[in-house]
UniProtKB/Swiss-Prot annotation:
<dbReference type="InterPro" id="IPR001576">
    <property type="entry name" value="Phosphoglycerate_kinase"/>
</dbReference>
<dbReference type="GO" id="GO:0004618">
    <property type="term" value="F:phosphoglycerate kinase activity"/>
</dbReference>
<dbReference type="Pfam" id="PF00162">
    <property type="entry name" value="PGK"/>
</dbReference>
<feature type="binding site">
    <location>
        <position position="119"/>
    </location>
    <ligand>
        <name>substrate</name>
    </ligand>
</feature>
<dbReference type="InterPro" id="IPR036043">
    <property type="entry name" value="Phosphoglycerate_kinase_sf"/>
</dbReference>
<dbReference type="GO" id="GO:0006094">
    <property type="term" value="P:gluconeogenesis"/>
</dbReference>
<feature type="binding site">
    <location>
        <position position="294"/>
    </location>
    <ligand>
        <name>ATP</name>
    </ligand>
</feature>
<feature type="binding site">
    <location>
        <begin position="60"/>
        <end position="63"/>
    </location>
    <ligand>
        <name>substrate</name>
    </ligand>
</feature>
<dbReference type="GO" id="GO:0043531">
    <property type="term" value="F:ADP binding"/>
</dbReference>
<dbReference type="InterPro" id="IPR015911">
    <property type="entry name" value="Phosphoglycerate_kinase_CS"/>
</dbReference>
<dbReference type="GO" id="GO:0005829">
    <property type="term" value="C:cytosol"/>
</dbReference>
<dbReference type="GO" id="GO:0005524">
    <property type="term" value="F:ATP binding"/>
</dbReference>
<keyword id="KW-0067">ATP-binding</keyword>
<feature type="binding site">
    <location>
        <position position="37"/>
    </location>
    <ligand>
        <name>substrate</name>
    </ligand>
</feature>
<keyword id="KW-0963">Cytoplasm</keyword>
<comment type="pathway">
    <text>Carbohydrate degradation; glycolysis; pyruvate from D-glyceraldehyde 3-phosphate: step 2/5.</text>
</comment>
<dbReference type="InterPro" id="IPR015824">
    <property type="entry name" value="Phosphoglycerate_kinase_N"/>
</dbReference>
Length: 397
């Protein structure tokens, strides 16, 4: 999917409205606990201000539900951004209105302003045309660099593009499109997808779309037990989606018909309770005792999955292999992250979907060893499902 980007336009002397994803975690004192998302936007910010653009940034923060919630003000973000850039960032009192417009018009070349939380207005999430037009009136160029919200048709991601031209992708979105797009449309083979997570229901569309593209699918996470039940295996107390057993059977049959190498675990780590102190044991699939549940993939599965990953040329990973937040059940996920980093060091293109898999890679300290970690959980999932993302579709081709 080719979209015009910051490289295709001149920003000098123009007011540039850029949608960023500054939805950062705050503690109870409104201190930012992780500024990764702010740092990720810096390449696009630097480019615009170095080119002499007058930059107006906009973002949401949290879920204020269309009301002004002072604890969700973007003021701490403006402060952190000014520290990172070593330059002052004007903080607007609102994202629309006369005062914000006057502040925008007063900007000089290379100056930056951050609008207040977009979601203080209910019209943002409703993609209200009048609200989108008012946002658009502040700028002469629109840039979207918020991949994390690209799957939402909101006023600041989709509606705004109808009222300001050019509308282009920032570097972050350009990078997402490059890696995710290449994996889905023109992958180097063998192409392996690793899917984890608790529920099949959240991954049906991804599986069905990837069946048209991949050579091998490795399945982990609690959703394996619904597949095992479909195969008539005993699963003990493990999590099963009973209403999806028939669907699991259908997916197994589809993989077989299309000659896709779909690998389920051969052993799991079982425990009697969901706790860090629980006694654990590795058991073969189908051999989970009635009073126990599977909470991670086992050592034999780790070996098999790692071999598949190391033999691949392209790997896409979405979803953890077990309950990685609890130490005894994190080994499978961490081992897969390690195999992915080892494969990448040998030239494999590795792409990690946002959310839990990204968190696992960070936890393992392996982020720098991965080709691309997506910045959008929901957006990368919808991209892998083959869906159009409204915030991307609206940009200039």
């Amino acid at each position: 999917m080719e979209k015009k980007s910051l490289y295709d336009i001149s920003c000098k002397g123009s007011r540039v409205l850029m949608r960023v994803d500054f939805n950062v975690p705050l503690d109870e004192h409104a201190h930012i606990t992780n500024d990764k998302r702010i740092i990720e936007a810096l390449p696009s910010i630097h480019k615009i201000i170095e080119d002499g653009g007058r930059l107006i940034l906009m973002s949401h923060l949290g879920r204020p539900k269309g009301k002004v919630v002072p604890e969700l003000s973007l003021e701490p973000v403006a402060k952190r951004l000014s520290e990172l850039l070593d330059t002052s960032v004007v903080m607007a009192g609102d994202c629309i209105g006369t005062e914000a417009m006057q502040q925008a018009l007063a900007l000089q070349d290379g100056e930056i302003m951050l609008l207040e939380n977009l979601r203080f207005h209910p019209e943002e999430e409703k993609n209200d045309p009048e609200f989108a037009r008012e946002l658009a009136s502040m700028g002469e160029i629109y840039v979207n660099d918020a991949f994390g919200t690209a799957h939402r048709a909101h006023a600041s991601t989709e509606g705004i593009c109808h009222y300001v031209q050019p509308s282009v992708a920032g570097f972050l979105i350009e990078k997402e499109l490059k890696y995710l797009g290449q994996a889905l449309n023109n992958p180097e083979r063998p192409f392996v997808a690793i899917l984890g997570g608790a529920k099949i229901s959240g991954k049906i569309d991804v599986l069905e779309n990837l069946f048209n593209k991949v050579d091998t699918v490795l399945i982990g996470g609690a959703m394996i037990f619904t597949f095992f039940k479909a195969q008539g295996l005993s699963v003990g107390k493990s999590l099963v989606e009973d209403d999806k057993v028939e669907l699991a059977r259908h997916l197994l049959q589809t993989a077989k018909e299309r000659k896709i190498n779909m690998l389920l675990p051969e052993d799991v780590i079982a425990a009697s309770e969901f706790s860090g102190d629980a006694e654990t044991m590795a058991v073969p699939v189908g051999g989970i005792p009635e009073n126990m549940m599977g909470l991670d993939i086992g050592p034999k599965t780790i070996d098999t999955f790692s071999r598949e990953i190391l033999a691949a040329k392209t790997v896409v990973w979405n979803g953890p292999m077990g309950v990685f937040e609890i130490e005894p059940f994190a080994k499978g996920t961490i081992a897969i992250a390690q195999a992915l980093a080892d494969a990448t060091a040998k030239g494999t293109i590795s792409i990690v979907g946002g959310g839990d898999s990204a968190a696992a890679v960070m936890k393992a300290g392996l982020a720098s060893g991965i080709t691309h970690i997506s910045t959008g959980g929901g957006a990368s999932l919808e991209f892998l499902e083959g869906k159009e993302l409204p915030g991307i579709t609206a940009l200039n081709d």
